[in-house]
UniProtKB/Swiss-Prot annotation:
Gene3D superfamilies: alpha/beta hydrolase, TolB, C-terminal domain. The lineage of its organism: Bacteria, Bacillati, Bacillota, Bacilli, Bacillales. The keyword Lyase does not apply. InterPro entries: 6-blade_b-propeller_TolB-like (IPR011042), AB_hydrolase_fold (IPR029058), PD40 (IPR011659), Peptidase_S9_cat (IPR001375). The gene is yuxL. The keyword Transmembrane does not apply. Its EC number is 3.4.21.-. Belongs to the peptidase S9C family. This is Uncharacterized peptidase YuxL.
Amino acid sequence: MKKLITADDITAIVSVTDPQYAPDGTRAAYVKSQVNQEKDSYTSNIWIYETKTGGSVPWTHGEKRSTDPRWSPDGRTLAFISDREGDAAQLYIMSTEGGEARKLTDIPYGVSKPLWSPDGESILVTVSLGEGESIDDREKTEQDSYEPVEVQGLSYKRDGKGLTRGAYAQLVLVSVKSGEMKELTSHKADHGDPAFSPDGKWLVFSANLTETDDASKPHDVYIMSLESGDLKQVTPHRGSFGSSSFSPDGRYLALLGNEKEYKNATLSKAWLYDIEQGRLTCLTEMLDVHLADALIGDSLIGGAEQRPIWTKDSQGFYVIGTDQGSTGIYYISIEGLVYPIRLEKEYINSFSLSPDEQHFIASVTKPDRPSELYSIPLGQEEKQLTGANDKFVREHTISIPEEIQYATEDGVMVNGWLMRPAQMEGETTYPLILNIHGGPHMMYGHTYFHEFQVLAAKGYAVVYINPRGSHGYGQEFVNAVRGDYGGKDYDDVMQAVDEAIKRDPHIDPKRLGVTGGSYGGFMTNWIVGQTNRFKAAVTQRSISNWISFHGVSDIGYFFTDWQLEHDMFEDTEKLWDRSPLKYAANVETPLLILHGERDDRCPIEQAEQLFIALKKMGKETKLVRFPNASHNLSRTGHPRQRIKRLNYISSWFDQHL
């Protein structure tokens, strides 16, 4: 008999990510990651899939993390990043003929994101360096916990990292033969998305070089001469661009981004830069699809940055697109022809194109199965290549969600899913939980979601939708929430409850719960201040006061302007009107507040304000603080805390529903 899923089962789920074909196509490297329950951490190792035998073998071992496998141009060496010898991750290379991996760097600040030069003689890595720090340092100077920290820029802290202390991501070239290092960038800016030109003479990267520490400023793409260091700006200095790659013939640059016409609600588009003519063209102006991964899940560890992959003839490239609850692979020609190569009810988070260009190898997650590797031949059916989660799927009862769609009063179509309890007995009724995603510009979709499975196993139905503001349904839809927080988005999620009850007569309309995190936490707070329809609520990493959020969040100083469309100093009352804290006196729903103590995106003072207000008024509430947890607790937090979080949620609903 199959077992019901529990919170602890996150320790049994394996993540299979970042597939990379070898240049000859005979094998592919990928990363397998899993919770290390004993150490309350994560373990990642590099595996190799052999295309001839269909089998996989591990190439790294141990309880640390080895990630980012990248083949040398001749396919004889594999580079990767690992923290196997200490806390700081370093660059290693391994021969395909066997033997021990060779460590190439020993930088106390760690390195990331390896990228081979076309001649195979060097590897580019990213290193975060603060003021006074160097790639030549052999020891990391420990920060004096009593030393004052001077702050002069707006972006002085970052969720998951804390105080930045003037550290920026720099690009460093490492010699494969000698290990000698050369720092290629030194601007006071984070440099990302690097790529070499085919001849190895140029390097493209993205950065905010405005000389102001303000994350809201334009993020541009630059081409650097590796001989002289001269820079050429590619993009128009009025948007956010990155994820660039050179065409094989060296003439074009494919890149993704937008001109922020709708601020951070703008769809990511595909662009082509003609290097010979110095002309930048948007290839997908008429495509109403977000060309990036915006799908939310909680079972994938790691993942990969997916940049455009060119065809050998330099006539087009492949990218990921977010559409209607799925992520798929899109082909875009240099003439602007666009069509999906694969768009099924699944979550593709990373892929690699075979050298013969006949098929992809992709990391795919489905609603009833955590991630695996699949072969996706052009125009043919997919084939599952790994069985990392076979045992988990075989031994557990997994609830299959039903797709729902409904029209709102103003004629907007809203999409979502209804997941029923894992076990249903006769005519027994069961409670319903409304789950609201964060962002707000993200998307629920066709993926395995452990939190929902845990609740379904406990006897709850779960309804989760993509309200206005979500990605996946076009530019007008994703932009609709801006300036209307708690408006039509509130109507959308409340109607989702009505639709679920209408579809399933077993749902008890008197036993309703609501939960959500980040923007979903804001909506949970907003809902319990507007209606007493729900009998229990759990708000996570939430927002309660937009006025204070403006100054305490790492993105608050521009997020409130962009999203609420109210100026902090000119429209203070309007920000207060949209703050759930204003309506705390209306709350009658028992409210559990979950928050990470090191959340710099939605700082814990947001939870504290709400908790104190409710407690002072005699409302039923509880605050649970997670030490050292960032905004990403539910996805990448310490495993033990992730398990406790899920148990807190289900226990609160068990108690009140």
